[in-house]
Amino acid sequence: MTQPSLNSLYSDHLRTLTARADEALQRGGFAHLVVPSGNTHYQLFDDRDYPYAVNPQFKAWLPLTRVPHSWLVYTPGKRPIVIFYQPFDYWHVVPDAPSGWWVEHCDIHIIRRPDEALALLPKQAERCAILGEAQSTLGAYVPNNPQPVLDYLEYQRAFKTAYELALLRIAQQLAVRGHRAAEAAFRAGQSEFGIHMAYCAAVGQDANELPYGNIIALNEHGAVLHYTELGQQPPQPLRSFLIDAGASAYGYASDITRTYAADPGSDFQALINAVDAAQLRMGQNVRAGVDYKQLHIDAHLALMGILKEFGVLTVSPEAALATGISAAFFPHGLGHLIGLQVHDVAGFAASDRGGRIQRPEGHPYLRLTRVLEPGMVVTIEPGVYFIDMLLDEVKKNGHAASVNWQRVEAFKPYGGIRIEDEVVCTDGNAENLTRPVFAAA
């Protein structure tokens, strides 16, 4: 996307953010919104910094992710002020001077020391809603994170602007580039570590830049939902590959999962194909007015139907759901909101004034319980796994006869399957952000 088009989209995005901030400040009774970018700080008993992570509330306003000790100040009716920390430092690379599509929309002040920000922040700290972590405290400017302000801003973050959708699309393109390289490395017999390195090289991002730790799981490791160990030697024989990996674009995240079989003629490949087709249908059901909780329950029924067809279950999908057996094979939620954060905020919010929509009973890991509305971007990530500790619970709970254990043993060496796309809820049909990028890659 060209800079002029991002310039126009950013201008509209900024109008949306200022309108939201106006309302949030009014609800909280504050005169100014003050957002620190966050600071670097040392690891315990060491002189090395933890990897820096920018405050999500800061990067909502600015496409800046590597500017610690900086600040965003917004006062209703005025242009946003950016206090940009650019130190004199010959030990490290300092941030480049502000440039890009956003600079003409803000008043920018360069500081060389963190405490120089004090002269540029609003005079009365008590009139400021300061959104940040405790380490960002500067003099009297202590992050207070007022709940009415956070409730409103975080609830509204579910509704993506056109600018945000553009950056999410860029993040998709970067991640798919990595996924294609990772699949090629798998087909070439690389180790998990080698596949991970191929992914990072293709995306052009290291572990600190990626939005989350890559899940690169070969064979049985696919049964560990968040497997991040990265084995140095490829297993023999090589059976399967599950990759859950994303990319970052100006502070916005992608989150994509694919599963591959080494043998395209195997039963496991057929099971992948069935889950993939079901996942595509689930994504098409992302529509305004649909309760995401129901999509999650429907996903359980669809996946258990597949396991019944493949001879893994001996009972109906409905019986598997009612008895909790389905949770042994599909133990996580269908998905979550995504945007500035991989698991974006306010997935349980009852309204922009707070409150919580509870998860369905028996589904403790679902991360989104809201009714879908236009502008929301969600992940759709059904999975089927063969996890010993969960399957043991099925036996302990007296449901051993509901499972064909011979079929389970046949699939266990492959670990599991997960397919994940990002989908936009619109006024009409769902827009899958992920599939077209794979098709074009």
Curated annotation (Swiss-Prot):
It catalyses: Xaa-L-Pro dipeptide + H2O = an L-alpha-amino acid + L-proline. Its EC number is 3.4.13.9. Mn(2+) 2 binds at D244, D255, E420. One of its GO terms (biological process) is proteolysis. Binds 2 manganese ions per subunit. NCBIfam families: PRK13607.1. Splits dipeptides with a prolyl residue in the C-terminal position. This is Xaa-Pro dipeptidase. It comes from Xanthomonas oryzae pv. oryzae (strain KACC10331 / KXO85).
